[in-house]
């Protein structure tokens, strides 16, 4: 039998054709998160703080020792230096911790003359976004519906249109063709009158 070193040769191609197979070594043992405590606490803020509780306590002591001016964020309940104030308000930690992010109505590009705009205004919709949406609990539509296709024909809903007939009607005839068609119609009319009057 071959020795163990030859058995570990891989059947790969290219640069590592005759190289030994590299065995995977875990860096550290896996640590499972306690999901029961996360579900009981029920908020992203509590879960985030439970992950970094020791770091947070250390940062409080370090910041208290420093004379750097800052403030305590009421939403996240952590101390923030003034130099990192804007970055903190944009951070995911602060956004997840905030109970309510105001969702103001964004200005729209529809004109007040549009049909959807007028219909919603008649039912109590405010274009400034002061009021909530339509409906009993104000959870309905807050923006007018844009009409992408206006129905200008007189054909009812659900009817099928014969596209060949529409194409024939839409093609415009020239002056000469109209004269020829008119003379054919006159001759046909005279022939019909002559036929029925002779009987």
UniProtKB/Swiss-Prot annotation:
GO molecular-function terms, A-Z: RNA binding
InterPro entries registered for this protein in UniProt: G_patch_dom (IPR000467), GPANK1 (IPR039146)
Cellular component terms per the entry's GO annotation: cell division site; cytosol; mitotic spindle; mitotic spindle pole body; nucleus
Annotated G-patch domain residues: 112-160
Domain of life: Eukaryota
Pfam families tied to this protein: G-patch
Protein's UniProt name: Uncharacterized protein C1604.16c
